[in-house]
Structure formats: structure tokens, C-alpha cells
A protein has these predicted regions:
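Loop-helix junctions at membrane interfaces
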Residues: 1-165
Length: 165
């Protein structure tokens, strides 16, 4: 076995461990179908800087953590993170210079902020799709139908979801 694969496996395991623990112990704001868990995206964002494989493993592992502690709709929203994690990790692997400014590593540059915005839009769209499916099959509390599709999906999941990244 190569040293590099053991390293990636270890990093994945540590990040998955963080991803499973975070929904259990961190504070949450729950406005179903929305649940905003403090630091829930951190392991996934760290994983994106390694490889797409690590990002996928961590996305699946954190989804498991949410399945243990939250309703199915929220856990499936966590599974939707697989989409933006895979796209983001692939892009970072192909364009590692996005985090460089004048040859120095920095997060404070416009190219990286643009990348974050695009990832945020993908994140929101994927979560909106999950909530839309639950909305249209009638598997949500009645109060969300009385608030309407626009509020439940676009405001609660779209705009608020965009700001969580």
C-alpha cells in the first residue's frame, strides 16, 4: 500500500469523524425543512482541498452523521452536499492556483471568492431540489404548504442556504 493512500484514508477518516460528531454536539437552528448546524460544512470544505475521492468520502460520512440525528429530509439535504463537494474538489484539483495571490497562498482574493460564490449557488440549488421533491410528493408538515412553495423552497432553502456557505 502506498504511503499517500494511507494518508488520504486517515485524513478522510478524521474528517468523517468530525462530520459525524458535529450534528450531534453543535448548536442547531431548526426551521424544518431547514436545519442550520454550526460548523457542519467545515469537514467537507477541508476535504475539497485534498482530492475528489476524499470529498466524496467525507460527504457520505457526514450524511451518515445527519441520518443519526435529524429527520430524513435534513439528512438528504446533507447527501446533496456530494454534488458541490465533488465539483469543488475537482475544480480545486485542476486549478490549484485559485487560492494563490501573487504566488502566495491566501483565501483573500477575488478568484477564490468567486469560486466560493459558485459553490454556494450549486449548494443551494441541490438543497432546493431535495426540498422541492419532498414538497411535491406531500411529505412535509402542513404549515409549509400554507406558507407556500416560494417561501419554503426559495427563501428558506435558497437564499438562506446560499448564505450558509
Amino acid at each position: 500500500m502506498r504511503k499517500n493512500s494511507v494518508r488520504k484514508l486517515t485524513i478522510s477518516a478524521l474528517l468523517i469523524g468530525m462530520g459525524v460528531i458535529i450534528p450531534m454536539v453543535m448548536p442547531k437552528i431548526m426551521i424544518p425543512p431547514a436545519s442550520f448546524t454550526l460548523a457542519s460544512h467545515v469537514p467537507l470544505f477541508i476535504a475539497m482541498f485534498f482530492t475528489p475521492g476524499v470529498a466524496v468520502a467525507v460527504a457520505l460520512g457526514t450524511t451518515f452523521g445527519f441520518f443519526l440525528t435529524t429527520p430524513v429530509i435534513i439528512a438528504l439535504r446533507a447527501l446533496s452536499h456530494l454534488v458541490f463537494a465533488l465539483i469543488g474538489a475537482w475544480y480545486l484539483q485542476k486549478h490549484p492556483s485559485i487560492v494563490l495571490k501573487n504566488g502566495q497562498f491566501t483565501f483573500a482574493n477575488w478568484r477564490f471568492q468567486g469560486f466560493n460564490f459558485v459553490i454556494g449557488v450549486i449548494h443551494s440549488l441541490a438543497e432546493m431540489l431535495v426540498v422541492s421533491i419532498f414538497y411535491f410528493i406531500g411529505n412535509m408538515p402542513e404549515t409549509y404548504y400554507s406558507q407556500g412553495y416560494f417561501y419554503t423552497v426559495f427563501i428558506l432553502m435558497g437564499l438562506v442556504g446560499l448564505s450558509t456557505v
